[in-house]
Amino acid sequence: MSSFIPLNFLEDTVSKKDLEEEHTRELQVEQAYKLFQSALKLQKQKQYESAYKVYEELFKLDIVSNHYFEELDFIRGLQDGSQNTDTDELTLLSPNVKSLRYLIFRNRGFLYLDMLKSNTENKSAEKVKEMFYPLLDDFCIALLYNEPDEKLLETLHEIFSYIGSERLSRFVLEYSLTSRKESDDLSGLLPIDQTVLSQYKTMLEHLSSGKFPKLDLKHLSFLEPIRLDIFAQQEKLASKKVAVIKSTSTKWVDLLDAINIHLKENQDESKIEDANRPRIRIFEPYVLTEEPLDIVRIEFTKRGVAVPATETEVTKAQPEQIVQERKPEEDNRVQRSSKRLSKVEDEIPAVTLESSHFLNMDYFRNQMNETIPNFEIFDVCSTYVEDGSGAQYIKDFKNIVSDWNDSYARAILSYDTAKSEDDNLKLLDLLSGYGKSEELKEKNIPPLGEIDIEFPELNYVEFKTYIIKHLLSKILTTKWSDKLYEKFTEWIVQFEGYIINDIDVESAIGVLEVLVDISTSLESQIKDSINNKLNKAVVNSMCQDLLRIKDKIIRWINYIETFPINDLQVASRFKWCQIIKEKAETKSWTENHPVKHKLQKLLGDAHFKINYPNYKNFIDFSKDSINSQLTIISVLAIFWRILSTSSTEDNKEAIRLLEDILLDSNTEPSDAILSIRNFLKQGSIDMKLSLWNILLSFYQSSNSGDKLTVGFEECVLFLNDYLVNEYVLLDEESRLVTLSRILGFYGSSISFVVTSLASTNWILMHPIKVQTLRLFFELSLLFEINEEASYISSLATSIKSKSTKSYHHLTNTLIKTIILILASIQKSNPQILHSVIRLFHTQLGLIGICGHAGGSFLEIAQEYLKSLPNSDQDICQIIKCKYHYSISIDGVVPADHGTARLDELNKNDCKELASFVLPLCFSKGGSTLNNVPKHDIKLLIDEIYDVIGDPDFDSNEALGRNKATLNYFLDNTRLTKRLFQEAFHGLVRLELGEAEEDKQFNGLYYIEGLLLFSSYKLRKKNMQSRAVELESAISLFENDIICGSNRFESWFLLGQSYGYLVEDDLIWTADKLTASDRKITTANLQRKSLICYLMAINKSLDESIKDVIKPVVGNLMSLFAKEMFSAVCEPMSMHAFKVQSHPRFINRVNGALFEPVSQFPAVDKTVCLKIIQQSLQLSIKSSCREWSDYYYLAKVQRKLDKPAGLVMETMASACRSAFKNKHADNIIEPHYNLVSFALKYVKSNRLDSKDALKYLIEDPLIKLEVGEETDFIKLIIKALNKIDSSDKKNWQHKAKYRLARLMQEEYHDVKGAIDQMSSFISLKTPNKALVSIWKPEPERPGKHFLYTFQYIHFYIELLKEIDDLDSLVAMLPKLRRSNSVMINLSIAWEILCSSVCKIIRESYGIGDNFEFTENLINTLPYQTFAANVKLLPDMMRRQSVPENLKSVLCFLFTVNDIKKLNNGYGPTSFIDDTLVTLYFMIYLNYFEKSSTEVTTDSPGLKKKIAKRDIFPLTNDILKAFKKDIEDVTKQKSYNELITAQKLKQGLNEDKSLENVPASANVNEIIVIDDDDDDNLSQEPATKKSKTESNS
């Protein structure tokens, strides 16, 4: 088999599964055949029980046991015939499986037959039955799978003949004769079996004579029990079945119940399963019974006899039942939550409610009455708790809320605007149904009496027909109970098909009336179900029922029309029924509707009256009712014109008609309008409410806000009047439902007004009197009191727990009423408006609903409060409720009112918030720099910025130009003297265009940047800051400027932000300070920082923002001066004055080139220092007396060579100011500089020592005690020690360094100086850092890298001075790795390497020049040297290394390591010469004589030794004598070896105590001045020693 698999091959998991199933099926077929063969073998051996067990095993296999449902589908398919569209699985079975099943069923049948034949004497009749019927089943099932063989057919023919089943016997013969012709097998080619044909002919001859042929079937005598059983069953079926139905009373309803129950008890369950379930409703129950009811007898029993309660299979669904059965999911959730909370509710005590329980509401009512003139709300608290108090509608409303039910919920939600657009058509339903109500029907109709007739013994169909005819004769003359009528209509629907051809015309009309009544009710239920959004399956089922009923109606109309009707009343009754049917089905009405003509035609014959006391949808027939219907049709035609409007013009016409009807706007109304008005006076309140609802909705859809307001006010006035007057006349039940509908209508109508009000920015177009709204406002307050009471006492029940939708409707009604009250008083006294808003919000917040109704109350309150003074706290409360951001003002924190949070803000929300929050950020007095918004506002600003995002520079050309202008200005502006002059005189102009941005967001980018910048500074104190935060802040400040603000604060903070970026570049690593070109990026940042500071200074001269500038100008000048000082001095060294972002193309003498850095700064350093001095003086003058300002001013004054006294006085001021600082313990710098300046001025003779000491004595930290000490240096050391001991955090290092310098320079105490420096310089291996110094907060960024270089340089010189070679060698690897912690590492490295080499050379008396090696190389013949060096290692091993060479080997090892560390880094000549010198010392020890021999050079040979030839030789020696070197270094240190060697040379042992001038080429010690001299990081200068050098 090929192993090739295509690349595009995809494994089909479904096919794979099918293959697996097929494989399993094949295995089962194989297993089944084996078992079948085994069973067949046992069957032949007459081991019947064993064979039966094998068959049982066979039927456990899936391939066999799954036969039932396949066969059932196959049989049903045959029964359905052409209507069958499903493919049954039986036809898809493989031939193997079909053959297998055929054999199994056939042979198991014969097994049963054999078992019956054997031992028949011991088998009971029941046992025979148990085996015979499975036998027949198996034979019959076998016929489904294959064509039967002759034996099977013959056996079936004999069995059927024996048991007397003539039809089945004949069927078998006919099947035998026709099966071959119909078969597709080869057997179809065989001729007909003559024996079977002969038997069939004989049977036909006997049947023609009325007799069935007798066959000799004695061999089947064992089936005699079966034959007898079948005969008994047939006799039983032939006898008549008498059904005795017992009724509990002689009432018709109980009789119908009894008949229904009897039928249900005798129904066949299998028939019910087979029947189509949805059709059971219209099924006659008798069809589903097991046995026929040939005779029906009725027996009346007394009450108490155990008769099952009436329960029909399917009752007609009533609207209330449907609502209860099919509630929406939301209502179900409410019920579930109510169940969960039932325990909590049970725990609420049954407290008797009193007015004192509602003090908040009472306070609110009193305040409202005091605040709003003439509002006068009644005492709602007392009214609620006192029974029987208040007007009728008040009492009824209390009853409604205390005993809430579904009918109130349906009524109050009937005008819910969320329903479908077809709701307006309810008005047509109301009008078209006018007259159906009970009050318009005849009252004096006698009730249907008890059963007064005898029932003949009839079969079921005749019996039921008899009852229906009798009841139809009384349906118009007697009044029935609803239950009886309901059961009777059910009978008519189920049974009408049996009586349609056996009934008189009058009864037929009665059946038609019942069907029309059912159809009309069902159509109304379907409409309600659709509007109530019930389950689609329920609606579909009702629609199917309606279609069936309509089919029945058509059939009955056709049937009745076949009768000649001569009786006028009967004919009128038939026509009236048809008119009612057509009217109910009419969807559109016109003036010339066919129904109208039919009514007019019928009017002439209406000289009598027909009552319809039982039909729900029939109006009594009379001349008055016909006239009423004609009027209603005329009204419907007009209303149809109103409701069917589609265009604006039609809409106007509809509005005009409604205004004429409802508002009496036409002084001369037409007759039609007058008739409608009269009609409405007689009609129910529902019609008027529907008309008002339509008018108001038209106003809203046509955006007629003023008309909507007027119409609403007129409508509310009408409702107020109605509730006080006409409402009282209604009965109690009608009142409660009517009041609920009025509240629902009011809530819907006020929603129209509030929606319109929102579209006009909450300005009411037409004023509404507040008193008009009082009645419904009071009802709403009663509702809220009831809700509050439900939390206090279990005697009160919350509507929310029973109907969430109703609760929200009433809550929203309260809020919208409040909105209209606010809109009505909006133009009154602002103080009243403010007080009312606060009252409403407090009260609504207490009950947690201020955010309901879509937040409309919060919207209108926010809009009105914008223009009211002193409303910030109220607006903050609205923001808390609306957006859940808590903003506190003056310590007042908004309360949590439990409102729902918005999912996320959108741009419109942000506009609203920004219009309040951004001005609030700028309104807190002074500059925002000193009043940074708090955390609560920060969260909100962040959210707004996230939604708004950065400006869209691509789509907004003005913004794009502004951005390019700003970037060009920052990138290309150089720090020139002219720029400084113009900035300090306010003359710099940056021309930015006016951007078209939303004014609401003016300042957003600045505030967001300010918050980000403040966060960075806070994190910076905790060492958690990130540069990315600064970059984001810079972008935001630039966006603020780009949008045209030219804001002083943005420039100021931009300067600080860029300054912090400079600090971030300089503070962590010295990488950007090691070379001039590496400083360019940092210098550009510093240049931008200074430019932004200058722009802020330029803007600070604007008189319009003088109040904002004044508090921060000192800080501005201080920060600018410090940033500029940092730019002028080391380590930046005026670099910011030389660079710009883009290199300039310069034409030099040596050619044109791009120059990133100018050779000379654009401003002289002295000018810069004077600007810094002036800025610091301005800062100090502005009362910003920061110690660092004095500190930097003193440094600048010293650099400008100001008098020593002035400098010292300024620094003393810095010391005094620092000592008063709350962090005085950490501020050491000014005190140290005071000592340092005193020392330098005294040594330079610019200040008398007494004057200098005076400053130190008066310093609050040093407090120098002079005593009798006269040595100025010792007093300075004492002051320095005092400063050092004051450093609690051990951050300061300059005092220690100065002490070390004084010890070395003044007292030649080198070891003491080394001890001082060792406090922060560590040569120990565990300490990875060579120098451990920290940057104190006041120290300029990058300065500590200069100090590190200075200290290392000084430390090396100290170690060299005492020949401490061990320490110097230990310093080598650490210093080599110190590139990131210091500047000028190469210089320090060169000094260290040269110092090690010098100490070694000096110990052997070799100077710093290269005379020794040069002389030797020039005199030593190369051939001799080459020959000797090959012998040198062996000679050293053979003769052993002498003592005088062991130290040379150790030094050679050290210098070789230095050479490796120095490779590719520093100068090498001095190190190489030292290495060669040491090697030649070893060489000369063995070949001293040969080195002076003179040889003749041969042509072509190398003549001179090169130093590089020596390096491999040194490596060879070091490798060969590595162990010897290790032994020596373990026994002696390098210092001991140096000391021993110098003793040999006759030098003084204690060199450290002798004042020896520096030898030639010794590097001068670099001193970094504490006031930032300019030559700090330059390469050290050298000077010649005054002593003579040794040759």
Curated annotation (Swiss-Prot):
Residues 323-334, 1581-1591 have a biased composition (Basic and acidic residues). It is found in: Nucleus. The keyword Transmembrane helix does not apply. One of its GO terms (biological process) is filamentous growth. InterPro entries: Hir3/CABIN1 (IPR033053). Coiled coil: none annotated. It comes from the Eukaryota. Residues 316-340, 1569-1591 are annotated as: Disordered. Keywords: Chromosome partition, Nucleus, Transcription, Transcription regulation. GO terms for cellular component: HIR complex; nucleus. Belongs to the HIR3 family. Has a role in a nucleosome assembly pathway that is required for the integrity of heterochromatin and proper chromosome segregation. This is Histone transcription regulator 3 homolog. The lineage of its organism: Eukaryota, Fungi, Dikarya, Ascomycota, Saccharomycotina.
